[in-house]
Amino acid sequence: VRGVLYKMSDASKDTVVEISGKLVEDCSEIRALCLRTQDFLSAVMASGKLSEAQADRTTDMIFIVDNLDRITEHLKDINENVNAIQQSDIKYSNTAAEDLNKYTLKLIDMYETSIIGLVGDVGVDRKKLELTRSELFELRAKMFRAHTKRVQKGKCDASLTAPFGSLLQDLETIASGCMDIADQVEEQHTIEIDLSSDSDEQ
């Protein structure tokens, strides 16, 4: 997921079609991996070898993977959106592209802040997350108002309003997903699961 966000932020006017097309494929692969991970964790739950605490933590992990899957689904939608529009006769403006890049960079910061607890003992900085999310809400509103002004002045085609609005909604949903992950990461650091056979006790 982090790699997809970084590649999105690196895309230029000349490379956006190629990169977005590749990222659609990458997102499909990530979602398939999420599904396999969920299946594995569900099988662990069904093994009957978890303590109550371990079962709770595994449930949290399943929830986190589900959120990663939903985030990836919206990333795929965004890249399909951008790929289709930028290959059409009517394209997003350079200003819109720059604003989308700013939003993506903030999403990277938010995602990394929310997920950091999964790879270490560092706590999640909730204050930073809430501040970034607030900034993203404001940026989304600013971007949409700027788009409508461009339409009003004839600098942007009105037919782009719906896909641009959908794109912004996908971005905001990803931000919400990051907050959901952070909620679980605060409770989920290390899972110790004993999957050994019970045969030694027999």
Tell where the protein language model's regions lie, with residue ranges:
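Cytosolic, long alpha-helical scaffolding segments
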Residues: 1-202
